[in-house]
């Protein structure tokens, strides 16, 4: 019986070998546990039209499963809203929470492949941090991910991606994500 050797994701290896040391020097942490890291990545795809046509949620679930490599959780409406013809319990979105190696591989694919494929991409807004080092940004369509076959897209679906870090301030989170290769706009 052969033992399959587990390889470390490329971005995780770079974080452990280079980025942690540079962040420690930059911010002068007294303890190695203070160095910020990525905790999880949440990918959310809201499908508001699913209230009218329940089949639309299946396309979002399939797209998210292909992009992230993990089965999405279907999000349901918490309360009824008559103006939107929405009833409590109707499916209105899909969400995936990535941790561990899957998270590192997704971030690597996002930064190295998906973001550069966006047309007229000028960089991510560096001001979209939440005050505690977490970063959220939106993508307008799913076609920039190479896992999705462009010909099989029935409709463009946007998504929100939240990168949750253990940083305590926005500056620490920004420095971490910039070191990981996130293309932020220069002011």
Curated annotation (Swiss-Prot):
It holds the Pfam family Ribosomal_L5. One of its GO terms (biological process) is translation. InterPro entries: Ribosomal_uL5 (IPR002132), Ribosomal_uL5_bac-type (IPR020930), Ribosomal_uL5_C (IPR031309), Ribosomal_uL5_dom_sf (IPR022803), Ribosomal_uL5_N (IPR031310). GO terms for molecular function: rRNA binding; structural constituent of ribosome; tRNA binding. Keywords: Ribonucleoprotein, Ribosomal protein, RNA-binding, rRNA-binding, tRNA-binding. Disulfide bonds: none annotated. SUPFAM superfamilies: RL5-like. The keyword Protein biosynthesis does not apply. GO terms for cellular component: ribonucleoprotein complex; ribosome. Gene3D superfamilies: 3.30.1440.10. The keyword Nuclease does not apply. HAMAP family: Ribosomal_uL5_B. Belongs to the universal ribosomal protein uL5 family. NCBIfam families: PRK00010.1. This is one of the proteins that bind and probably mediate the attachment of the 5S RNA into the large ribosomal subunit, where it forms part of the central protuberance. In the 70S ribosome it contacts protein S13 of the 30S subunit (bridge B1b), connecting the 2 subunits; this bridge is implicated in subunit movement. Contacts the P site tRNA; the 5S rRNA and some of its associated proteins might help stabilize positioning of ribosome-bound tRNAs. Part of the 50S ribosomal subunit; part of the 5S rRNA/L5/L18/L25 subcomplex. Contacts the 5S rRNA and the P site tRNA. Forms a bridge to the 30S subunit in the 70S ribosome. This is Large ribosomal subunit protein uL5.
């Amino acid at each position: 019986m052969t033992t399959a050797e587990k390889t470390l994701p490329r971005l995780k290896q770079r974080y452990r070998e280079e980025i942690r040391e540079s962040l420690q020097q930059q911010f002068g942490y007294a303890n190695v546990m203070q160095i910020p890291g990525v905790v999880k990545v949440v990918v959310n795809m809201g499908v508001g039209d699913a209230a009218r046509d329940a089949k639309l949620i299946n396309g979002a679930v399939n797209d998210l499963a292909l992009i992230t490599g993990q089965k999405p959780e279907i999000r349901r409406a918490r309360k009824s809203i008559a103006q939107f013809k929405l009833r409590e319990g109707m499916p209105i979105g899909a969400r995936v929470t990535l941790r561990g190696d899957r998270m590192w591989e997704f971030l690597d694919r996002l930064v190295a492949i998906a973001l550069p494929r966006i047309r007229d991409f000028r960089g991510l807004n560096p001001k979209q941090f939440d005050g505690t080092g977490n970063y959220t940004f939106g993508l307008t369509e799913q076609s920039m991910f190479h896992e999705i076959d462009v010909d099989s897209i029935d409709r463009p679906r946007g998504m929100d991606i939240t990168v949750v870090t253990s940083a305590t301030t926005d500056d620490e989170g920004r420095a971490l994500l910039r070191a990981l290769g996130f293309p932020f706009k220069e002011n």
